[in-house]
Amino acid sequence: CKPFAGEVRRLREGVLAFASEPLHLLVPHKNAVNSLKSTRCHVRSAPLSCGSFVRVGDDLLLGSPELCFAQMAASLPFVSLVKLGTELCSLYTLQPNGSAGYERVLPPTTPRALEAYLGRCAGMRGLADARKAACLVAASSGSPMETALALILGLPLRLGGYGLPRPILNHRIDALQSGPNAMERRYYLCDLYWPEARVALEYDS
């Protein structure tokens, strides 16, 4: 069915009050496309893979982080797609005004979940790039600058990075609690950590 102005307004005043404009809607055929300035319709007649949607109400499904990543592969440059994937797997949020929030306890998705979802997909523009990009996504970034640093250091040389092994972000290291070298804190989180080299890197901390 075609989304009507009243339905869109009700969603914008309720569960989707946080969303920026235009509101992107997925419709099954061209006849369902509306002309509302506050929305942008995308036509998809073929079935989508399991895990494409998250139910947030009796009559509302939101595209999952995995579906968002797959769809954005059709329009984003490759490195920007890797960055988006890392943000979807991060511990922070990005607001429409560009500011970051740090209230997440768990990331919306993981690199493994992205790869698994993309492996089930078919017939989507940019799918090959999405699968390649998912292999470069880092998990659990704690800030936009940690994401930027992980990409700069970990991306291959051909993509503008330094080609280092992909680091573990916000890795926990338990501290000694007794003896002459006992630490005040029970554990520390390393912004970037390379376990094979036993090297940790902190950004501005």
Label for each model-derived stretch:
Residues 1-125, 147, 157:
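Short gly/ser-rich loop at a beta-strand->alpha-helix junction or flexible surface loop bordering the NTP-binding
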Residues 104-205:
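Surface segments flanking catalytic/ligand-binding clefts of nucleic-acid enzymes
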